Amino acid sequence: MSINIRDPLIVSRVVGDVLDPFNRSITLKVTYGQREVTNGLDLRPSQVQNKPRVEIGGEDLRNFYTLVMVDPDVPSPSNPHLREYLHWLVTDIPATTGTTFGNEIVCYENPSPTAGIHRVVFILFRQLGRQTVYAPGWRQNFNTREFAEIYNLGLPVAAVFYNCQRESGCGGRRL
C-alpha cells in the first residue's frame, strides 16, 4: 500500500487495528440492497440484516479468494476486548464471481452494535489454490492477521469498511 495518510483505511485505523499495509490489486464490490459499501459509509443495523452481495474482480477463474468480515470494535470502540468479531467467512471464491460461488465456512451474522460506532471490515485475500479451511471455535477474538498466516494467504488484495451503530430509538427505559 503506498502510504497515503488520507486513505480512509489508515485514517480509520483499519490499517493498524486489523490489517497491515497492503497494495490493492483486485476489485471488491460489496452491496447491501442498492447501497454499495464505500470506506466510512454509515449503515444502520436494519440496513445490514441480510447478507450482502459481493462481487470480486479479476480475470482468471483459476484464481480463488477468501473473504473475511470482522468488527474490531466489539463490544465497544472504547473497550474492544473481544476484537475481532467474525461476522462472515467465505473461501474458494473464483475470480470474476461472488460469494455465492464460494464455500461459506462461517455463516453471515449481521452486525448489531450496542455501544458506539463500529467499523465493519470486509477483507479479501488471494489463495494459492483451493484449500480446506476450518471454522474457528467461536466468533469473538478472531484475528485476521493470524488467520492469514495459518492459511498462507499473505497480505490482503482488497478491503472496504463501513460504520455501524445502534439504531436510535432502540432499547432505553421502559415503563
Swiss-Prot record:
Keywords, ordered alphabetically: Cytoplasm, Developmental protein, Differentiation, Endoplasmic reticulum, Flowering, Nucleus
GO cellular component, one term: nucleus
Superkingdom field: Eukaryota
Annotated effect of mutating R119H: In ft-3; late-flowering
Annotated PROSITE patterns: PBP
Record Pfam families: PBP
GO biological processes: cell differentiation; flower development; meristem determinacy; photoperiodism, flowering; positive regulation of flower development; regulation of flower development; regulation of stomatal movement
GO molecular function: phosphatidylethanolamine binding
Family as reported in the entry's similarity comment: Belongs to the phosphatidylethanolamine-binding protein family.
Tissue: Mostly localized in leaves vasculature.
Induction or repression: Levels follow a circadian cycle with a progressive accumulation during the day time. By light. Expression is delayed and reduced under SD conditions. Repressed by FLC. Up-Regulated by VOZ1 and/or VOZ2. Up-regulated by APL/FE. Down-regulated by the H3K36me2 modification at the FT locus produced by the interaction between EFM and JMJ30. Repressed by MYB56.
Signal peptide positions (record): none
Organism: Arabidopsis thaliana
Quaternary structure note: Interacts with FD/BZIP14 and FDP/BZIP27. Interacts with FTIP1/MCTP1 in phloem companion cells. Interacts with NAKR1.
Record's subcellular location: Cytoplasm; Nucleus; Endoplasmic reticulum
Gene assigned in the entry: FT
Protein name (database record): Protein FLOWERING LOCUS T
Misc. remarks from the entry: Mutagenesis of Tyr-85 to His converts the activator of flowering 'FLOWERING LOCUS T' into a 'TERMINAL FLOWER 1'-like repressor of flowering.
Outcome when changing V120F: No effect on terminal flower formation
Highest classification ranks of the organism: Eukaryota, Viridiplantae, Streptophyta, Embryophyta, Tracheophyta
Job of this protein: Component of the mobile flower-promoting signal (floral stimulus or florigen). Promotes the transition from vegetative growth to flowering. Required for 'SEPALLATA3' (SEP3) and 'FRUITFULL' (FUL) accumulation in mature rosette leaves. Seems to acts in parallel with 'LEAFY' to induce flowering by regulating 'APETALA1'. Translated in leaves and then transported to the shoot apical meristem where it activates the transcription of several floral meristem identity genes. May play a role in both the autonomous and the long-day flowering pathways.
